[in-house]
């Protein structure tokens, strides 16, 4: 079967939810038995999001093969079974750096390097490479039509549609259809102008996804179809909903998947959305609720912890619980004290970088340990739990990480200089290495200790989880901390690096060096998050007695 391409663009305003719409359509097509993948093309000039501020860009999602990518790839993996790779996300910066590398190497034989054809050809080559082996590839272009940054991507996709044939390509455009209260009606003019902008660069959309706070009336959909030269059945109303996991059913109810299959002449069974119906049923019918305190430094933008937020919700689904997340700035713990932690059922300290707010996180871990509050530490959340235990239990009063104090006397966490990657190759880093692309990244094996809580939760001896960090537990000082009672219950493939720690004589205190949130999905959940939320609910029931 020839690969079919769906190109997704957005107009009028940004943040319309192109990624969610693309992932939802992919979920329906996957439910029809098709092999689907999704790509995200980002117009910014950074090579990848790895060094971008989480408060500007949101979280960095790490793929199985170690790519630092846009958070939309997290949405893709949560909606479909296909795992994303380095091929599924690239930026203007990555395209330009590759073209310039080829130019320096002499690949272009002295030609003048131009946006057309060299940049557009590189974009097309990467899209085609990422589509290999799939029935349908959905390609989302970041930004808004009309932005200067996205023009090379749109031109490349226009050319690609001509090359592979319009019978194998479909353009899907998301627009805003605002409701004007004073007029008492929705307005279609912004959509018409957005389509006009798209037409000016040679692209005629085949499907319009119209975002609004309500369903768009049939007469307005007919009007949009007429003036935008689109089939009326291809004008899809996408209203605001309580849960993003309602979107697949909403799109299917309007026949979007049927339209796509007919366009590509695909014969496949009806979509079976039973799993998504079960997700929505659990979400709508919780048997209880818990409040989780998330203590971090990027709390002003919840998207900085997008996958963690979603993983907590998935754990709620697994346990039939409604999970309320209370965001707590770790600096508030430093300035206001542990009073800000009162009234929560469980504490989660996620990953992060830099010294700001670290002492607040350490006090948070101490509060959770001493007050028997369920605690889940992720990446930095594990490291600060180790520092706290070393200082207050193991007698290493000057314990710290060399990330925060390069001259600390007792660096229980230190810069990792050498480790093995998933293929068994040795990676080496130093203090002088660049910030971008120099971390321990991607899926790594972890051995779980028999009899541990982690082993009980996962139900197997060996697991694979994703990493994104530079610093590791210092094995030189580890014996003294273990002697004081701390349990190391997860080790790397070569059994040299600490992956999971547990505090004994505590209802639930588990911390891991990896990022379990990247592999949690609404249909399957994740054992660590499920166990944590269950423990938090047990704690909640005690507190209300």
UniProtKB/Swiss-Prot annotation:
Provide the binding site for Mg(2+).
Answer: 72, 140
Any one GO BP annotation for this protein: 'de novo' CTP biosynthetic process
Annotated binding of L-glutamine, by residue: 352, 380-383, 403, 470
Q: How is this protein's activity kept under control?
A: Allosterically activated by GTP, when glutamine is the substrate; GTP has no effect on the reaction when ammonia is the substrate. The allosteric effector GTP functions by stabilizing the protein conformation that binds the tetrahedral intermediate(s) formed during glutamine hydrolysis. Inhibited by the product CTP, via allosteric rather than competitive inhibition.
- Keyword Ligase in the entry? The reply is yes
GO molecular-function annotation terms? ATP binding; CTP synthase activity; glutaminase activity; identical protein binding; metal ion binding
Catalytic machinery residues:
379 (nucleophile), 515, 517
Q: Which organism is it from?
A: Haemophilus influenzae (strain ATCC 51907 / DSM 11121 / KW20 / Rd)
Query: What's the name of the protein?
Result: CTP synthase
